[in-house]
């Protein structure tokens, strides 16, 4: 049965109301109408309230309210990125923050990442800033390379979490399997750090901003080594998701040289059902409010509109595409 054909057609009145609403939003954005002439409810999903995305979502909501008083943004926390993306797919929100690796898994419907079917209604608004994959070992464990992890006691993050899936990809590309390690742990980052402090764990990894507090704290307690993720490893993994990156010298105590690694983008996401004019307005407000976002969290210092398309793993929403064409980011 053709499900699409069997759906009831929209009434002329409903279609007319929708067209009128879109026209009002477009006119308000263009300045042809008072911004109060149309009201738009916009729900922003920010993941866990303790995470980086939550203060940025609050700041973006405030910026939307200021620049477009007709918008009625609300910020909602979720259990994490996966839940946020599922909510978007179902049309229960308009905007969400995500990491590029999780977004790629959602788009593909990767079952071992917790997605039973592809979330094919998702669309990108733009790449915000990178998370760096940071592999660290206790200096006295004698580990200097990924190969040196063989036979060691390693924590790879919570099973099936984003970082654990990153660990699988990176270690596999380096010729390592979990069976290669002397002992494997599936622990949250905080617990892994505490075990390393107590010399009960040799190494761990995290996907985080540079200078993440947990690693700074670890480096003040024990001597650490930041393990390189070399270019040949990057070439063997999904280069649509992972980007070449560098952890600059002196990011952590005792780290005297730049260390190559890979990074994944933080991405602002919407879904195909959100009107083009709404997404255009959100995209414009996002990139003209970097100062306000930086005030909410220093991660926004790395935001650069000229890099908004780097590392995107799903299609752009047409409303975002329009903004990038107008500003010359997209030719």
PLM feature segments, named:
Residues 33-39:
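Sec/Tat signal peptide C-region and signal peptidase I cleavage site
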Residues 42-67, 71-72, 131-198, 310, ...:
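Bilobed "Venus flytrap"/periplasmic-binding protein-like clamshell domains
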Residues 114-128, 133, 251-260:
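A structural signal for short loop-to-beta-strand junctions that line the ligand-binding cleft
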Residues 152-169, 241-312:
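Ligand-binding clefts/hinges and TM-proximal coupling segments of bilobed small-molecule sensing domains
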Residues 55-59, 65-88, 254-256:
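Extracytoplasmic small-molecule ligand-binding "clamshell" domains
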Residues 6-27:
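N-terminal secretory signal peptides and thylakoid transit peptides that target proteins
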Residues 100, 111, 141, 177-269, ...:
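Pocket-lining segment of extracytoplasmic ligand-binding domains
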Residues 187-191, 197-199, 208-226, 232, ...:
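An extracytoplasmic/periplasmic, membrane-proximal ligand-sensing/linker region
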């Amino acid at each position: 049965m053709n499900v699409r054909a069997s759906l009831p057609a929209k009434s002329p009145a409903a279609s007319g109301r929708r067209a009128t609403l879109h026209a009002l939003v477009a006119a308000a954005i263009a300045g042809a109408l008072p911004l109060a002439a149309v009201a738009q409810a916009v729900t922003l999903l920010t993941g866990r309230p303790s995470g980086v995305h939550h203060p940025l979502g609050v700041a973006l909501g405030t910026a939307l309210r200021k620049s477009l008083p007709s918008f009625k943004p609300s910020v909602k926390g979720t259990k994490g990125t996966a839940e946020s993306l599922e909510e978007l797919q179902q049309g229960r929100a308009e905007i969400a923050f995500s990491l590029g690796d999780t977004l790629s898994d959602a788009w593909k419907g990767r079952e071992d990442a917790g997605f039973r079917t592809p979330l094919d209604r998702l669309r990108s608004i733009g790449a915000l800033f990178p998370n760096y994959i940071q592999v660290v070992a206790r200096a006295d464990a004698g580990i200097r390379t990924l190969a040196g992890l063989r036979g060691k006691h390693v924590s790879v993050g919570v099973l099936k979490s984003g970082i654990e899936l990153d660990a699988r990809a990176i270690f596999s590309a380096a010729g390592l399997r979990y069976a290669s390690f002397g002992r494997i742990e599936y622990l949250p980052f905080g617990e892994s750090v505490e075990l390393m402090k107590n010399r009960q764990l040799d190494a761990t990894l995290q996907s985080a901003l540079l200078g993440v507090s947990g690693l700074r704290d670890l480096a003040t307690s024990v001597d650490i080594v930041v393990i390189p993720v070399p270019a040949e490893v990057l070439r063997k993994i999904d280069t649509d998701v992972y980007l070449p990156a560098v952890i600059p010298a002196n990011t952590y105590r005792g780290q005297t040289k730049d260390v190559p690694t890979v990074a994944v983008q933080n991405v602002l996401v919407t879904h195909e059902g959100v009107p083009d004019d709404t997404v255009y307005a959100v995209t414009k407000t996002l990139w003209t409010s970097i100062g306000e976002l930086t005030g909410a969290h220093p991660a926004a210092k790395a935001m650069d509109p000229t890099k908004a398309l780097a590392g995107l793993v799903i299609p752009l929403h047409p409303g975002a595409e329009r903004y990038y064409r107008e500003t010359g980011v997209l030719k």
